[in-house]
Amino acid sequence: MSLKGKDFLSVHHLTVDEIYQIFDFARILKAKQKAGEPHPLLKGKTLGMIFQKASTRTRVSFEVGMWQLGGSALFLSSNDMQIGRGEPVKDTARVLSRYVDGIMIRTFSHLEVEELAEYATVPVINALTDLLHPCQAMADIFTALEHKGELKGRKLCYIGDGNNMVNSLLHICAKVGMDISVATPANYAPDATIVEQAAVAAKLSGSKITILDDPLAAAQDADVLYTDVWASMGKEGEQAIRKQAFAGFQINNTLLQAAKKDTIVMHCLPAHRGEEITEDVIEGPNSVVFDEAENRLHVQKAIMALLMAD
């Protein structure tokens, strides 16, 4: 079982064994980093990073990760590239493949990422699209594994917008055998195709998917409570409408009481405190938000090394 030379576009494309292979390697790399032990697995390698959406955690974690692995990362914004001026994606893919050893892309269109991967001859990593956020979901469930010790039979409850984040969480929870309950307002449900894909995986793993519009019901006996912003990047114009629609879809102390006593609280950040999550919960003892943010580094390093190392 080898991920060498493959793309990382979606958790849906991974086997359960491949998910745990990434987790196991992330655990090893995290221990090495904490011990100050060098691990230059990508010495002499370069990652080209295409950003059409701004980011804090994605850019820093990939750049630092490549540096810790002995390689280098090249930041490419759409303002700096011909892809931002109308060059075909397939041309960009083939040109960059002659210069770099891997391509990471954070953009709007998932179809664009798939086209990039089709024409690139080096591994392509999806760092976020409007449809999926697989690197974040992998880091989230790795964090749950660290804190809970076992994933199968655990329950994750997601409260909020049916966006790219919950789409990837549906994929991974179904794969690893975690139950997932999703509470969203009417008209803000997760992508129907993603739900169908997750349902197929859930049948194989024995997990359960529940989608409803009642946050308290969704949170009952949850091992993990998860939320994200009400208006994702590109949806800022809908802020006022969404504030009204999502009123009540908030992780707060009332919701915390419905979940298990030892539930962990997650948010992929940035958080709008007082909207999708309260200040006291994100800063409280159940919150693992910053463990989760750190684990982006370790999980992404594992992905890069498994895809790009000789």
Residue ranges and their predicted role:
Residues 262-263, 269-310:
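Adenosine-phosphate binding glycine-rich loop
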Residues 1-60, 64:
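Positively charged, low-complexity intrinsically disordered leader regions
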Residues 200-279:
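Rossmann-like adenosine-cofactor binding region
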